[in-house]
């Protein structure tokens, strides 16, 4: 890489067009998607397991990771990228790719040992909303689950309005087991 940087510096001294040439080279590289996807995957709380005490492997999490890498490499429009992750199963002509994109909602830490299925559902929704707020609004929504803050723009009523939408999303597999339905 350092050799490439040196070569770019030399080429740039000769011609300002070098910037455009090198930018195009970098953006058409398959490594472009890998590099920038890692930032999105951090925000989306990507991991190959659910973390926490159980640390159960998410056998198909890689599909979501590959979806994100491919989306960056294909220069997928941001609005489409977001819609597919939040409702890829509901878009017209939903495909395997758009359904895999909903892995965004499946990822993240979950206490799968929680014996109370309804509490587990609500905790998952809380985690999804908190991630949604941090990802798309740049703010935490978690506090509004319990109370209003004097200076926060999200009130409890707003929180539970959003939670109602996510409550209709099936993220729990077999209700008697309490296990996450892995996509």
Regions found by a protein language model. Name each.
Residues 1-183:
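Short, structured secondary-structure elements
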């Amino acid at each position: 890489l350092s050799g490439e940087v040196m070569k770019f510096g030399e080429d740039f001294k000769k011609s300002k067009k070098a910037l455009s040439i090198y930018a195009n080279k970098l953006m058409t590289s398959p490594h472009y998607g890998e590099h920038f996807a890692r930032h999105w995957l951090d925000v989306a709380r990507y991991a190959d397991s659910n973390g926490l005490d159980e640390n159960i492997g998410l056998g198909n999490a890689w599909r979501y990771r590959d979806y994100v890498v491919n989306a960056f490499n294909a220069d997928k429009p941001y609005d489409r990228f977001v819609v597919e992750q939040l409702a890829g199963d509901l878009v017209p002509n939903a495909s395997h790719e758009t359904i895999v994109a909903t892995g965004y909602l499946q990822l993240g830490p979950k206490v799968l040992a929680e014996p109370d299925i309804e509490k587990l559902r609500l905790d998952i929704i809380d985690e999804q909303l908190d991630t949604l707020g941090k990802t798309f609004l740049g703010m935490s929504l978690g506090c509004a689950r319990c109370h209003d803050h004097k200076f926060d723009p999200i009130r409890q009523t707003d929180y539970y309005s959003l939670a109602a939408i996510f409550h209709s999303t099936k993220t729990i597999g077999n209700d008697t087991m309490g296990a996450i339905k892995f996509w």
